[in-house]
């Protein structure tokens, strides 16, 4: 019997999902009933992405842009609770944007702790308003599970193994400096984890910048966005085939639901590469759009923009819909959908523009462009000698230091169709950028 218990504890320690299902209780959304913590499809994908990253990099650095009620915070709470309650000398730090949110998070953790099976429930040394310390004067786990609100007590200089920063886009004035202090408490490697998650709050700000830096692969972080339509709860079945056909026939004709935008959503898809398996693919169905209409009517007070804010379809839509822009958001969102659709239908080619490849006395051409999949130049349409082109350039400082430096960008436009046919995006000295733009101009 004792040997069986040892084997069970070992499995619980090495298999977080087994631990979630058999040891943790959470409150079911809506009913408030305590239920076993079983991962939904979004949580399951995030879990596999994190496990893959920790196997590859010996740590997790993940930034998550989310829609409402996907259970991202619940998953991170459960993951970190498992780390602290099943391992010695671990420190968990969770920081939220408001005291109310901090209280909700801590109550979730306390519920997990209070309902643990007694056989694996660690001894509690201290439990305060926003802190649990497992251990005893004689030893024990000596693991700390602590929560705080941004702007609260200083944590700079502390050692943190697992950091969760919640709703970072809402951290407000001083939030970026506070975040920097927290991140510097987490060392690289050693299976440490730092997870930043938030709904969008417009363009600009530390969360927006960090997300896009990670998305482009320039920061050492991994970015992920979960669109609303991949969640199985966000569908509404039709009563019969006739109702489904009738719905399809009028799709995109009602301005309350976005008009043409609604029709363009049908078939929009996303994929998640979670390892050795084939990528998981999710696609907008008529059932998704049926639920979308109901949600706009009942949960968003017939306000389409509120739906965009709460349930974005793309990462760009998430940031655009929540900002205070000059241009109409509906049209911007429609343009985003058009661009996403076109990028799937006409993928870009990658190229590299060598800098100062030419020297006097060599036969090599002065201005050259070389094919390279991950190059700084994206090309959707190669030059057509029968056309003229225009190049617009936005020159940045050029220094490739840190995530706060801007990108220099050159965009090639076909003035006859107003299409963007190529884009150069890089961080180099402005003089060297001029060489690249000259090469681009020679090509076009």
Label every PLM stretch briefly.
Residues 120-136:
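Long, charged, glycine-rich C-terminal linkers/tails
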Residues 90-111:
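Conserved Walker A/P-loop ATP-binding site and its immediately adjacent core
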Residues 61, 77, 81, 95, ...:
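RNase H-like, metal-dependent nuclease domains and their acidic two-metal-ion catalytic environment used
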Residues 1-61, 119, 257-258, 263-264, ...:
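N-terminal accessory segments
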Residues 185-190:
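Short, conserved loop/helix-junction motifs that constitute active-site signature segments
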Residues 83-90:
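Post-Walker A helix-loop "phosphate-sensing" segment adjacent to the P-loop in P-loop NTPases
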Residues 56-80:
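Walker A/P-loop
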Residues 98, 148-150, 197-202, 228-230:
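A short beta-strand-to-loop transition that corresponds to the Sensor-1 phosphate-sensing loop
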């Amino acid at each position: 019997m004792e040997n069986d218990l040892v084997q069970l504890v070992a499995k619980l320690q090495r298999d977080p999902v087994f631990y979630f299902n058999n040891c943790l209780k959470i409150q079911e959304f809506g009913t408030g009933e305590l239920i076993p913590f079983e991962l939904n499809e979004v949580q399951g994908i995030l879990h596999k992405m994190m496990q893959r990253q920790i196997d590859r990099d010996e740590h997790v650095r993940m930034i998550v842009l989310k829609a409402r009620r996907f259970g991202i915070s619940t998953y991170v709470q459960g993951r970190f609770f498992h780390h602290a309650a099943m391992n010695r000398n671990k420190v968990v730090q969770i920081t939220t944007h408001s005291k109310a949110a901090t209280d909700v998070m801590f109550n979730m953790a306390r519920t997990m702790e209070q309902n643990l099976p007694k056989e694996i429930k660690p001894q509690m040394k201290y439990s305060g308003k926003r802190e649990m310390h497992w251990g005893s004067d004689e030893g024990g786990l000596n693991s700390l599970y602590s929560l705080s609100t941004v702007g609260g007590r200083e944590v700079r200089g502390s050692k943190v193994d697992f950091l969760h920063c919640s709703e970072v886009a809402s951290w407000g004035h001083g939030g970026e400096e506070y975040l920097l202090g927290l991140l510097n408490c987490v060392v690289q490697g050693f299976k440490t984890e730092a997870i930043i998650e938030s709904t969008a709050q417009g363009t600009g700000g530390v969360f927006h910048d960090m997300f896009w830096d990670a998305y482009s692969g320039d920061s050492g972080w991994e970015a992920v966005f979960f669109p609303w339509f991949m969640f199985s709860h966000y569908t509404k079945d039709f009563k019969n085939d006739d109702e489904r056909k009738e719905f399809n026939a009028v799709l995109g004709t009602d301005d309350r639901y976005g008009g043409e935008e609604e029709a363009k959503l049908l078939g929009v898809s996303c994929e998640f590469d979670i390892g050795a398996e084939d990528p998981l693919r999710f696609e907008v169905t008529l059932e998704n759009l049926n639920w979308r209409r109901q949600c706009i009517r009942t949960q968003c007070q017939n306000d389409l923009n509120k739906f965009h804010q709460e349930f974005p379809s793309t990462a760009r839509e998430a940031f655009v819909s929540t900002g205070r822009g000059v241009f109409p958001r509906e049209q911007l969102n429609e343009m985003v959908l058009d661009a996403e659709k076109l990028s799937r239908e006409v993928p870009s080619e990658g190229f590299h523009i060598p800098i100062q490849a030419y020297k006097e006395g060599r036969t090599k051409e002065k201005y050259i462009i070389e094919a390279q999949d991950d190059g700084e130049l994206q090309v959707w349409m190669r030059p057509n000698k029968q056309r003229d082109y225009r190049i617009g350039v936005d020159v940045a400082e050029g220094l490739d230091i840190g995530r706060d430096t801007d990108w220099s960008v050159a965009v090639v436009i076909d003035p006859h169709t107003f299409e963007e046919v190529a884009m150069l995006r890089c961080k180099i000295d402005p003089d060297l950028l001029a060489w690249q733009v000259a090469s681009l101009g020679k090509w076009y």
